[in-house]
Amino acid sequence: MKKFLPLLVLLMLMPLFAAAEDAVQYDAILSRDTYLVEEPGGRSIIQLPDREQVEVLSLGEEWSRIVYDREVGYCKTGYLYHFVSRDPFSYPVPDRQRVTGFASFNVATDIKGGKFNGLTAQPGQVFCVMPGEEEYYRVPIWRDAAQVHQAEVTYYPFADWQSADSGDVIGGFTTFYGEQQGKGKAAEREHNIVLGCERIHETVIRPDGYFSFNKLCAPYSQNNGYRYAPNISQTGFGYGGGVCQLTTTLYNAVLTLPLQVDEWAMHRYTGIQYAPQFFDAAVGSYSDFIFKNTLPYAIRILATPQNGILTVLILRE
């Protein structure tokens, strides 16, 4: 009997190994009609409808192994978007912006990128950056990036969340806004951004606690202090227009850390101009942005509007 014990143990553990291998890494949405296939380039199993949600078991450069309607197979990775990680510690969201720290301007600096008309940043204004070439930092701006010379700023790398001390900045993100988004109501749009920042600024989320944007900022109405400004809707205007830029900035800041996104909606497939496609976050009567603090300590949110530079930083409390 003893000689069969290792075999019995192995047989008992096999389902656990299979379960681990088949663990869902992400939820995602299909961007088009396609087919679930047995293996990359292989025979079709079932049709996959456009805009349906699937579970991603493994994410590959060209093909991903997924589950749809209890069927397991493969589809092209390029047909998937709206990724929500089931385990942000092990599976960060693909194609997120890899910002590594924040900086403050030492001198007045002209900055522009993509279709953004640009602005003159003032000394002391804070923004998040990515590594650049040689003596430059890269600043994500409107689906593009600007180059800022290191001599013009003071740089502070994000602290590693695992070894951070109280007060350390561990994540963040920046987006840019201006007159060209206003449709004649740029001041009203900026008012809404500033009001939203005031309502989430200094919010502390305890370990295993949840942050709900709507809990702090909704309803988006005149009675709640918001002004009529451009938004993404059938009419193109609404009370609270511009607040979603704050939500988007916060969402991308959250993605710099292993925090669990619980509820998140995009405006539309094409996205919005001030953030990369598939990385905007809409809020309203029927949508919220909610995440869970999965870190072993409390975190604090700092939301700072700076005359066209909107920066959200996340600190260890």
Name each model-derived stretch.
Residues I46-G78, N117-P157:
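SH3/SH3-like beta-barrel superfamily modules
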Residues D160-R206:
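Polybasic, low-complexity association/targeting segments
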